Amino acid sequence: MVGKAVTTPAVLREVLLKYLAHHPDASDTLDGIRGWWLPDMQPPPSAEALHATLEALEAEGKLIHTVMVDGSVLYARAR
């Protein structure tokens, strides 16, 4: 029996950084990132795994986040 593929934090990080390299002005919410930045990732990352990876990239200075008036959070490449 073939095991189910696992989206590791390292793979998720690599995919996000590649997306931002090709779309340097991109910004989106966690749900938007899951739907638009990672549409072909199978299995799709959990919201928790994606949030942890986004926080790690922010801690590394690769991403920033902005809290909008409605409370939603946008993530974007750090400049």
Kindly give the residue locations of the regions a language model identified.
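Short helix-coil junctions and helix-kink-helix linkers
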Residues: G35-A47
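Basic amphipathic alpha-helical segments that dock to polyanions
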Residues: L50-E60
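Short acidic, hydrophobic short linear motifs in intrinsically disordered regions
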Residues: A26-L38
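Short alpha-helical segments that sit at the start of domains
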Residues: M1-S27
